[in-house]
Regions:
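Short glycine-rich or small-residue beta-strand-to-loop segments that form or flank ligand, phosphate
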Residues: 1, 19-20, 140-142
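Short helix-terminating capping/connector loops at secondary-structure junctions
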Residues: 11-16, 134-138
Length: 174
């Protein structure tokens, strides 16, 4: 149904939308979920890299039978990154490690939402996703959280034109 609706929008407007289902599941099911999403016409698949683990992101990204891009989502990251005395830095987890796992796109929070993400961390996550790093391809930043047409120009100013906007809540609330 989603892919048919996306195709109808394209025919009417000339703008292409990509359906990106969440395939996060038990580890033994994620790869099959990716294959099934691809068979059903999804243009991308999302895995919660925190809940499922970046190893699962890597397994799907490296599987030759999965030809659609993989988006690694960040839900739950705060439990690992927000303690100033323990854990892991969000720029390392969501930026560099997500990229090393092979994610084509990496979701991160926005400084324009109610979540208290520091601007410095936001910019360092994007930098780690996109900076030159040996022969690794960049990971496309997917900025989400409080995204709407009013703050899109600021995000493009912060991140550049090579950015995906995670507008799930904005669409659902419309």
């Amino acid at each position: 149904a989603y892919t048919a609706a996306a195709e109808q929008v394209y025919q009417e407007t000339g703008h292409r939308a990509v359906y990106c289902p969440n395939i996060t599941d038990r580890p033994e099911r994620i790869l099959e979920n990716a294959r099934r999403a691809q068979e059903l016409g999804a243009g991308m698949a999302m895995i919660n890299g925190v809940a499922a683990g970046l190893g699962m992101v890597q397994a799907v990204a490296e599987d030759a039978s999965v030809a659609i891009p993989i988006l690694s989502h960040y839900a739950g990251t705060g439990t690992l990154t927000e303690n100033p005395r323990a854990g892991i830095s969000s720029p390392l987890l969501l930026g560099k490690l997500t990229r090393l796992a092979g994610a084509d796109a990496g979701a991160l929070g926005s400084v324009y939402s109610s979540y208290p993400l520091l601007r410095d961390k936001y910019l360092r996550i994007v930098h780690n996703q996109t900076m030159p790093l040996f022969d690794l391809k960049p990971t496309l930043p997917c900025v989400g959280g409080g995204i709407h047409p009013g703050n899109t120009p600021r995000i493009v100013e912060d991140v550049g034109l090579d950015v995906m906007l995670g507008v799930g809540g904005a669409i659902q609330g419309h």
